């Protein structure tokens, strides 16, 4: 990855804006200090190498931090607080905007919710007639490689929420987001069940590690 000694990330942020910073520089500002004999920039780089990316660092669970040198419980709680702030920021945006007009924000929000789960979780976003998100609900939790989904229960919750449309999502704990034939089959069943109640299924996102696949983008819905 590499970093140039002598750079001052805080000064760079003030002069050029936060968007000018690299992931290493952003993380270094957050960490504030390094370790004895280890510059904070080097520590930030080492952490990003260990976790793979800034996103994976932010969404890692507590057990992953036990082996991370330089990140104690205090830093862990700060990182999780930032992740939760990000999730709430995305939700507030989706509650005010048409979710289908900003699929990237929807995908990022669902990644924050599902990407690092160790079991398959099937989640539904309930939307009003303007495609603003009313709420989300984890409908079903399965094993590491499957989850049993009941379309009628999804329809029932949609009616309770007075939802006009839905966005479906589930994760693949393996990290690979490519949908299976079973994923496509259950999506078709849910679409048909919802149409009987004049509820539209707008998309189904399969969430991996740092990636997702949209059924709508592939023309499957």
UniProtKB/Swiss-Prot annotation:
Gene Ontology process terms (BP): proteolysis
Disulphide bridges, residue numbers: none
Keywords: Hydrolase, Metal-binding, Metalloprotease, Protease, Zinc
Motif (JAMM motif): 170-183
Residues annotated as binding Zn(2+): 170, 172, 183
Pfam families hit by this protein: RadC, UPF0758_N
MF GO annotations: metal ion binding; metallopeptidase activity
Keyword Calcium (UniProt): no
Stored CDD domains: MPN_DUF2466
MPN domain mapped to chain residues: 99-221
Family the UniProt entry places it in: Belongs to the UPF0758 family. YicR subfamily.
Protein name: UPF0758 protein PC1_4100
Naturally occurring in which organism (per UniProt): Pectobacterium carotovorum subsp. carotovorum (strain PC1)
Species lineage: Bacteria, Pseudomonadati, Pseudomonadota, Gammaproteobacteria, Enterobacterales
């Amino acid at each position: 990855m590499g970093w140039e000694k002598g750079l001052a990330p805080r000064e760079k942020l003030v002069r050029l804006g936060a968007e000018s910073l690299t992931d290493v520089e952003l993380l270094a500002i957050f960490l504030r200090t390094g370790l004895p004999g280890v510059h904070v920039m080097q520590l930030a780089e080492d952490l990003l190498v260990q976790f793979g990316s800034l996103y994976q660092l932010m969404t890692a669970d507590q057990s992953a931090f036990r082996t991370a040198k330089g990140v104690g419980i205090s830093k862990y709680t700060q990182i999780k607080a930032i992740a939760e702030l990000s999730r709430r920021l995305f939700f507030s945006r989706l509650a005010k905007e048409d979710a289908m007009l900003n699929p990237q924000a929807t995908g990022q929000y669902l990644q924050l919710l599902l990407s690092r789960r160790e079991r398959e979780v099937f989640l539904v976003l309930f939307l009003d007639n303007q495609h603003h998100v009313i709420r989300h609900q984890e409908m079903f939790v399965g094993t590491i490689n499957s989850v049993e989904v009941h379309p009628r229960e999804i329809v029932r919750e949609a009616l309770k929420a007075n939802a006009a449309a839905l966005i479906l999502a589930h994760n693949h704990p393996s990290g690979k987001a490519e949908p299976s034939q079973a994923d496509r089959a259950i999506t078709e069943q849910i679409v048909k069940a919802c149409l009987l109640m004049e509820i539209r299924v707008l998309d189904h996102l399969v969430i991996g590690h740092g990636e997702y696949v949209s059924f709508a983008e592939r023309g499957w819905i």
